[in-house]
Amino acid sequence: LIRGLTKKDKVQAIGEIGLDYHYDLSERDVQRYWFRRQIQLANELKMPIIIHSREADQDTMTILKEEGAFSDERKSWFEPRKGPDGQLLADSRVLLHCFSGSSEMAEQYVKLGATLSICGPVTFKNNRKTRQVAERIPLEFLLVETDSPYLTPEPFRGRPNKPSYVEYTAR
């Protein structure tokens, strides 16, 4: 079914796929199995991957590496992006949606050619860690998103998020 749907022009990526250990609604082994299969499908179809990873940082990184999400072959499918000095930077077309990992993990992902997105929680007063991570990500590998209607930024926290609030996240 999914393979057939990807033949349509509107499908531009495989995702949001990944691991969510926060609620453990699905057994972790089952999550890891299907995550691998979805990465394999994205590689087979030469499509970008959008990752959801919640409280599963190391498993996510390990599986992405093992399944070739950062391979030289995969990077060859996509145009490189230009860095701040005009140099060409390899792009694996892997996007980590609402990244909440460490600065060290962010640096590893950037070196592998991944893009990291930052959401509303970066604006929360008690979320210094995510602000520090965002400051260290080169702009060429940073995406600002809303995750609307969730993860509403300050000063609208407690209300449903809206796409128009992205400017508060970007500040």
Where are these regions (language model features)?
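Structural detector of well-ordered beta-strand residues that form the stable sheet scaffold
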Residues: 50, 95, 117, 143-145
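Short secondary-structure boundary segments
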Residues: 120-122, 146-148
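Short, basic, glycine/proline-bearing loop/turn elements
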Residues: 113-119
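Divalent metal-binding pocket/active-site signature
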Residues: 1-112, 124-127, 132-133, 151, ...
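Active-site-adjacent capping/gating segments
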Residues: 137-139
